């Protein structure tokens, strides 16, 4: 029972059957429309955010299983800030402000996938990401 795993990063609830996913699924002789529909259903709660998705395909039976990961840190931060995209020049152009509570909330959400051992270390990591995408925290850089 050979299996193939496909890992992709998609926009939540907005997957299209075109490249790069469509051709990959077609090579495995899967119904592309059905897979895309299931991915969109599974990622609907993360609409507008980039989300890692893993598709495990049984090559004999053509059955597939979809698992959705936690959205990227920058996507979670942008959603908290109400911003569309990160700053092209984060050192000089700030795009929004978030509270320290928002940073802690994102750190708690992402902690299982971070290498940080403590919540404090996770918060520092999230603060670094916030700075790199042009966010201020409690009106401070």
From Swiss-Prot:
PROSITE patterns: RIBOSOMAL_L11 (PS00359)
A GO BP annotation: translation
Molecular-function GO terms, alphabetical: large ribosomal subunit rRNA binding; structural constituent of ribosome
Keywords: Ribonucleoprotein, Ribosomal protein, RNA-binding, rRNA-binding
Xref: InterPro entries: Ribosomal_uL11, Ribosomal_uL11_C, Ribosomal_uL11_C_sf, Ribosomal_uL11_CS, Ribosomal_uL11_N, Ribosomal_uL11_N_sf
CDD domains for the chain: Ribosomal_L11
HAMAP family: Ribosomal_uL11
Function as written in the Swiss-Prot or TrEMBL entry: Forms part of the ribosomal stalk which helps the ribosome interact with GTP-bound translation factors.
Family designation: Belongs to the universal ribosomal protein uL11 family.
Complex formation: Part of the ribosomal stalk of the 50S ribosomal subunit. Interacts with L10 and the large rRNA to form the base of the stalk. L10 forms an elongated spine to which L12 dimers bind in a sequential fashion forming a multimeric L10(L12)X complex.
UniProt name for this protein: Large ribosomal subunit protein uL11
Protein source organism: Acidianus ambivalens (Desulfurolobus ambivalens)
Gene name tied to this protein: rpl11
């Amino acid at each position: 029972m050979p299996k193939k795993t496909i890992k992709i990063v998609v926009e939540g609830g907005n997957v299209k059957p075109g490249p790069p996913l469509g051709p990959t699924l077609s090579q495995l002789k899967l119904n592309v429309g059905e897979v895309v529909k299931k991915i969109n259903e599974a990622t609907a709660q993360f609409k507008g955010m980039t989300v890692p998705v893993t598709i495990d395909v049984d090559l004999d039976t053509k059955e597939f299983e979809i698992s959705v990961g936690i959205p990227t840190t920058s996507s979670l931060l942008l959603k908290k800030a109400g911003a569309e995209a990160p700053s092209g020049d984060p050192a000089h152009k700030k795009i929004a402000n978030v509270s320290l509570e928002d940073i802690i909330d994102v750190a708690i959400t992402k902690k299982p996938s971070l290498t940080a051992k403590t919540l404090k270390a996770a918060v520092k990591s999230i603060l670094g990401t916030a700075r790199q995408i042009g966010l201020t925290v409690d009106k401070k850089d």
